[in-house]
């Protein structure tokens, strides 16, 4: 099965819950996934279905669950959610007459199925707030319905029927009430592919904005567009977002498929001893694929790479006959040194010989002094894109690049995508949208042509000028 289209085992996916929150899970076979108050399900029950499918959790053995709750639970089963079964989630179907009425109505005035047989008021002037007494259905009744394995739609329908002043609400207020109850009692979830944009959205909703340097989805897309990421390119990248930008570049280069023979490669420069690419574990790429197409170098090795004489002075490879004569202990030590030798050769190649097809920088280091040194190995007519949380940093970088003839037209960009909230007769921006998103600087690496030499006038030209003067006289 294609992991880009179907739900397969050992795959990271993102689950969208009725409350609007998301959860990242790894689908290990023969295991269960708990969604808290929304229930739990077996992973094997959803394998093979297309990505984007919505499932509903239900329980058949309700009596057994109630009996288990009455028993004294063990210490490891105190907060354990009972595992239920899953089925395809289907919205409540409308009858033929209601469907015809909906088709005749304007698209902005479509009423939810649950509210089509419920009266509503044009205004809420007759609505009197008397608190919880307006609802005749108690929480004990709701819990009893849940223990009887009643679906969310059945519980919500009973709550609407038991509401004393529901018919005095406006249709818009009724829709908001219906939405809140679905978020509370529904037990469905949607399985989606964990793309880089979905991962960024999950991190922002979780509150890890500083982890991704306040990067927005629009800025992430602009980075790919301006850098002109291609499948056969070799790109230099400095990523301090935990590997999110590298994951996005891998998606654009390989499309989520593992092709070990693909020529594309990403060279990641890290300022610490070990690279921070923790988010690549959610990319569904194997470690073998990542090791081949993602090369990591420390910033010290890139700026001051070792020479070939220094590497060969510390270690010289042996022939096969000499290796076979070594004992087991010395052979393992030789293997470690040989691995170090090939690593140093790769460092020398990437830092001194390789020409890159683009440069992407998302770092908190001082960009005006960092970018010109990183861009020395970028090929001519190739883009350079720098991301920063603050415009002032990019302004200083732009002034530095303007005075250097190797960089063409540094431009600072800012992207904003403003979602709008719509209601009947109303349209305004979403009030809960977040600001920020960062800024981008974009330019091209060029190779300046040498200045033409100024030729001094020869003696022949001087003689001709003297003859012209004599004729004029």
Curated annotation (Swiss-Prot):
Lineage: Eukaryota, Fungi, Dikarya, Ascomycota, Saccharomycotina
Gene: TRM6
GO BP: any one term: tRNA methylation
Biased composition, class Acidic residues, residue ranges: 452-465
Keywords noted in UniProt: Nucleus, RNA-binding, tRNA processing
Compartments reported by the entry: Nucleus
Chief place of localization: nucleus
GO molecular function: RNA binding; tRNA (adenine(58)-N1)-methyltransferase activity
Functional note: Substrate-binding subunit of tRNA (adenine-N(1)-)-methyltransferase, which catalyzes the formation of N(1)-methyladenine at position 58 (m1A58) in initiator methionyl-tRNA.
This protein's name: tRNA (adenine(58)-N(1))-methyltransferase non-catalytic subunit TRM6
Record family assignment: Belongs to the TRM6/GCD10 family.
Cystine crosslinks: none
Segments of this protein annotated with the region Disordered: 452-473
Assembly description: Heterotetramer; composed of two copies of TRM6 and two copies of TRM61.
InterPro entries membership: TRM6
Any one GO CC term of the record: nucleus
PANTHER family recorded: TRANSLATION INITIATION FACTOR EIF3-RELATED, TRNA (ADENINE(58)-N(1))-METHYLTRANSFERASE NON-CATALYTIC SUBUNIT TRM6
């Amino acid at each position: 099965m294609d992991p880009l289209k179907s739900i397969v085992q050992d795959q990271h996916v993102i689950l969208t819950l009725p409350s609007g929150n998301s959860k990242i899970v790894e689908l290990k076979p023969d295991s269960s996934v708990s969604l808290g108050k929304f229930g739990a399900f077996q992973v094997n029950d959803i394998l093979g279905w297309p990505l984007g499918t919505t499932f509903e959790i239900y329980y058949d053995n309700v009596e057994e669950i109630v009996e288990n709750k009455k028993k004294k639970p063990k210490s490891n089963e105190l907060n354990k959610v009972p595992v239920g079964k899953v089925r395809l989630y289907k919205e409540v179907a409308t009858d033929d007459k209601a469907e015809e009425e909906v088709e005749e109505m304007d698209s902005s005035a479509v009423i939810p199925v649950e509210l089509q047989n419920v009266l509503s008021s044009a205004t809420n002037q007759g609505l009197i707030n008397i608190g919880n007494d307006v609802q005749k259905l108690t929480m004990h009744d709701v819990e009893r319905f849940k223990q009887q394995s009643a679906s969310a739609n059945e519980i919500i329908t009973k709550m609407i029927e038991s509401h004393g002043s529901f018919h005095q609400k406006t249709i818009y207020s009724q829709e908001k009430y219906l939405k809140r109850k679905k978020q509370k009692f529904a037990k469905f979830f949607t399985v989606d592919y964990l793309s880089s944009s979905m991962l960024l959205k999950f991190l922002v909703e979780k509150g890890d904005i500083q982890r991704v340097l306040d990067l927005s989805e629009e800025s992430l897309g602009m980075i790919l567009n301006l850098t002109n990421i291609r499948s056969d390119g070799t790109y230099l990248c400095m990523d301090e977002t935990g590997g999110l930008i590298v994951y996005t570049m891998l998606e654009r280069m390989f499309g989520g498929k593992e092709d070990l023979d693909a020529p594309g490669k990403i060279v990641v420069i890290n300022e610490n001893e070990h690279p921070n690419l923790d988010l690549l574990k959610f990319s569904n790429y194997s470690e073998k694929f990542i090791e081949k197409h993602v090369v990591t170098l420390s910033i010290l090795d890139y700026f001051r790479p070792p020479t070939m004489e220094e590497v060969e002075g510390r270690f010289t490879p042996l022939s096969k006959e000499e290796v076979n004569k070594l004992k087991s202990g010395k052979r393992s030590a030789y293997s470690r040194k040989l691995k170090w030798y090939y690593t140093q050769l790769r460092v020398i190649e990437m830092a001194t010989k390789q020409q890159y097809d683009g440069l992407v920088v998302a770092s908190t280091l001082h960009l005006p002094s960092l970018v010109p040194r990183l861009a020395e190995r970028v090929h001519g007519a190739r883009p350079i894109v720098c991301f920063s949380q603050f415009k002032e940093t990019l302004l200083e970088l732009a002034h530095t690049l303007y005075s250097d003839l190797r960089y063409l037209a540094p431009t600072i960009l800012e992207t904003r995508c403003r979602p709008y909230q719509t209601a009947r007769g109303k349209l305004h921006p979403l009030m809960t949208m977040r600001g920020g998103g960062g800024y981008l600087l974009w330019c091209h690496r060029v190779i300046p042509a040498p200045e033409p030499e100024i030729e001094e006038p020869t003696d022949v030209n001087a003689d001709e000028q003297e003859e012209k003067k004599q004729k004029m006289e």
